[in-house]
């Protein structure tokens, strides 16, 4: 990616954990990358799925801010906090970049209700941890079950799994839909399967077992 930087480059986005694969960038590789990025290029780290990560080597964008003033960290209340319908999140950066963002931001984009819900969510850390830990445990269980079935799955640090199904994607999607399971599919590439409630995950496991047989 650093080789693609030119004089016209102004912003670089890094998504970790990545959507739709769930893979993460590690601290050492990000630090090495940042050393090759000019200081006038802003590096935005999208960490929407940060709370689901259990890889100790994964980068935490907040730890980079002191030494890299061109880094901006984005986080959201839509994923782990469960406030997707309220459309609220935040950016963490230097005061200079924050001032630039305020100058170009559309006013009144976040409602009072969304702000109150976000503040309340920050105070409910125990509930957040319980919910995230349950999802992570289910992610591991579903990963193990589907791997035993023979599916090629990328180890994920998000609240979903990526199945590399290639040319068979559309057929597998039809089987899943016939079992009442709806996933995000990319034809000829793969399927992103979100981790839900235990019973929902069981249904997905059963549907995919039938897709293997099909």
Task: Place the predicted regions along the sequence by residue.
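Conserved PLP-binding catalytic core of the aspartate aminotransferase-like
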Residues: 135-136, 140, 144-179, 195
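PLP-dependent aminotransferase class I/II
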Residues: 70-147, 151-154
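Active-site pre-lysine segment of PLP-dependent enzymes
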Residues: 1-8, 20-43, 47-78
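Short amphipathic alpha-helical segments
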Residues: 86, 157-159, 187-191
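PLP-dependent enzyme catalytic core of the Aspartate aminotransferase-like
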Residues: 28, 32, 174-214
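Short beta-strands and strand-loop turn motifs
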Residues: 11-17, 43-47, 154-156, 184-187
């Amino acid at each position: 990616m650093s080789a693609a930087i030119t004089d016209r480059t102004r912003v670089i986005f890094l998504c970790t954990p990545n959507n739709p694969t769930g893979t993460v960038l590690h601290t050492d590789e990000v630090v090495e990358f940042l050393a090759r990025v000019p200081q006038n290029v802003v590096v935005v780290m999208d960490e929407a799925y940060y709370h689901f990560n259990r890889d100790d080597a994964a980068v935490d964008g907040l730890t980079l801010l002191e030494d890299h003033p061109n880094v901006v960290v984005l986080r959201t209340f839509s994923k782990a906090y469960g406030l997707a319908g309220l459309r609220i999140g935040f950016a963490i950066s230097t005061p200079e970049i924050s001032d630039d963002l305020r100058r170009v931001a559309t006013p009144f984009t976040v409602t009072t209700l969304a702000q109150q819900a976000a503040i309340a969510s920050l105070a409910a850390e125990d509930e957040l941890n319980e919910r995230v830990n349950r999802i992570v445990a289910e992610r591991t269980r579903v990963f193990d079950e589907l791997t035993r079935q023979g599916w090629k799955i990328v180890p994920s640090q998000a609240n979903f799994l990526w199945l590399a199904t290639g040319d068979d994607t559309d057929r597998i999607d039809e089987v899943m839909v016939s079992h009442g399971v709806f996933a995000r599919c990319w034809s000829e590439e793969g399927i992103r399967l979100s981790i839900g409630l235990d019973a929902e995950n069981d249904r997905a496991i059963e549907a995919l077992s039938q897709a293997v047989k099909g």
